[in-house]
Design a protein with these regions (language model features):
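Acidic, metal/ion-coordinating pockets
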Residues: 53-311, 355
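Bacterial N-terminal signal peptides
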Residues: 11-18
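Bacterial N-terminal signal peptides that target proteins for export
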Residues: 2-10
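Acidic/polar N-terminal loop/beta-strand segments that form early-domain functional surfaces
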Residues: 23-25, 64, 102-104, 380, ...
Length: 506
């Protein structure tokens, strides 16, 4: 994309309404705002008077969460420059205002994913952010990549409850806290990730790690902050306000003045007498959150989230504008084919399933697979976006299927609709052909992704029973990942100038 075209998109007006989609939908949750807690002097107002800094005795810290690589501005995402510009345009912002991240920064787009978040990590040096809590998707490329990106960052990666099984300790490269000096006021920042989110990470990526729910790890980090002179301490937590781990933290009565949250892609704000104030600022560059503190007392005075408008890109720093444009211009656009019609999450998922089905048929022509002998299966949450009418490129495919999941065959599985499409009692997957109406069991091969190959979801997805799983290989003899499966299917369908119609996958 040319710089002039990028800037025209970045400077166009895109106002988010309160129910605008963030993936499947933004969620706005505000609870208990009429009950300030003991450690706050909250205003909780969006009025101009209260958005201005009252005097020199206040400072504001900002948080972003679940950015998911949305560097480039599009019709759906405001992009990195608008996010920085919106924060810098907030009346509470000063050059001393720190910015933190609550995780899930890298995974989600081709521009960020082509080098597994390294370039985005460097861009965030210039954003700048002061610390980043690890999210579950930071582990998508393995812990070695986290450490590699940490070496490129001028800010620490935080996760107090990350434990290495072999040592029973937190890895040396990951810190549990940092103390920020904000014009003479010392603020402790502790980072953590939801303990139950371990199940959302491919098991092979975290074989030697676990996420502890022991709140003593957080308590020890608070003590370290206080020993280093922190007058107040906050938690940057990659987790939803209603999660089991967050509730455990709340019940533990830890001395956090506030919690910046993430993971659920929501706008959440909660405040009451009995809890630590919690705020989450949306996702995908479309929002942020903040807390304002008194330098005199260390009390939390204001907490809120803010929608981002794409026109705020004009407030971004020239240095970040130049580096962002240079990065985007350096990434080639590869066109695989063309589509027409109205795409949504459902028909995009159906397309991916048929791509998997086609890949299995092509790999094993001797099996003569039909919809009576083969079923394709993919988890709903693994499809992260939707196609759009027009060119189908490397960037759009990466938005839909950003994970390095290997396509896998499970031979001779006994299945019905419940075994395939649910996890417990909840809808979890979609299949092709649609198995939701299958009430009687049948024996079929399953083509799926290795992330799902586990006894934890269904007996049908066992990696070993009755026969071992088989990873598909591409023409080079390498593991055939879902991104390449989708890209190759688009190229196959669009040969000889054919156009893919979204309606064919409804």
């Amino acid at each position: 994309m040319k710089k002039t075209f990028l800037k025209s998109i970045l400077l166009s007006t895109l106002t988010l309404v309160s129910l605008f989609s963030c993936g499947d939908g933004f969620k706005f949750i505000i609870s208990g705002l009429d009950k300030p807690s003991d450690n706050t002097e909250l205003k909780n107002s969006n009025s101009d008077d209260q958005n201005n800094i009252d005097d020199k005795n206040e400072f504001t810290i900002f948080s972003i969460n679940d950015f998911h690589g949305k560097i480039e501005a599009t019709s759906a995402y405001n992009g990195l420059l608008a996010l920085q510009g919106a924060i810098r345009g907030n009346p509470k912002y000063t050059e001393d205002s720190p910015i933190v991240s609550a995780g899930d920064m890298w995974q989600g787009t081709y521009v960020s994913g082509f080098d597994k978040g390294e370039s985005l990590t460097k861009l965030m040096n210039d954003f700048p952010i002061s610390a980043m809590a690890l999210g579950n998707h930071e582990f998508d490329w393995g812990f070695s990549k986290i450490e590699s990106n940490q070496n490129k960052a001028n800010y620490p990666f935080l996760c107090a409850n990350l434990i290495q099984k072999s040592t029973k300790k937190r890895p040396d490269s990951i810190k549990d806290h940092i103390v920020l000096d904000i014009d003479g006021f010392k603020l402790g920042v502790v980072g953590a990730m939801g303990a139950e989110l371990e199940s959302s990470i491919k098991s092979s990526r975290i074989e030697d790690f676990e996420f502890s729910n022991d709140t003593n790890l957080l308590k020890n980090a608070i003590t370290s902050c206080e020993d280093e002179g922190a007058k107040s301490t906050i938690l940057v937590l990659h987790d939803d306000k209603d999660s089991t781990y967050t509730n455990t933290i709340q019940r533990s009565k830890l001395n956090f003045k506030g919690i910046f949250g993430g993971h659920s892609h929501s706008f959440q704000l909660e405040q009451s007498n009995s809890i630590i104030p919690y705020v989450q600022g949306g996702c995908d560059s479309n929002g942020y959150s903040y807390m304002t503190f008194s330098k005199t007392t260390g009390a939390l005075k204001d907490i809120n989230y803010v929608n981002v408008d794409s026109s705020m890109a004009s407030n971004a720093t020239m240095d970040l504008i130049q580096k962002t444009n240079n990065l985007i211009d350096s990434i080639p656009t590869i066109t695989y084919g063309t589509s027409t019609g109205r795409w949504n999450k459902t028909n995009t998922t159906n397309f991916v399933l048929q791509a998997m089905f086609y890949a299995a048929k092509k790999k094993y022509p001797d099996k003569n697979y039909t919809t009576e002998t083969l079923v394709a299966l993919h988890n709903n949450s693994g499809i992260r976006g939707k196609f759009t009418s027009g060119e189908m490129t490397n960037k759009t495919v990466q938005t839909v299927s950003p994970f390095d999941n290997v396509v896998t065959i499970l031979p001779n599985r006994e299945v019905n609709g419940t075994l395939l499409e649910t996890a417990g009692s909840k809808p979890y997957c979609r299949s092709y052909p649609n198995s939701s109406g299958w009430t009687t069991k049948r024996t079929m091969d399953i083509v799926t992704i290795d992330y799902l190959v586990s006894d934890r979801y269904s007996a049908a997805l066992s990696p070993t029973k009755p026969t071992p799983a088989i990873n598909l290989e591409n023409d080079k003899g390498e593991d055939y990942i879902i991104y390449d499966v989708v890209a190759d299917y688009i190229k196959y369908l669009c040969q000889d100038g054919n156009v893919i119609n979204a309606a064919d996958y409804n």
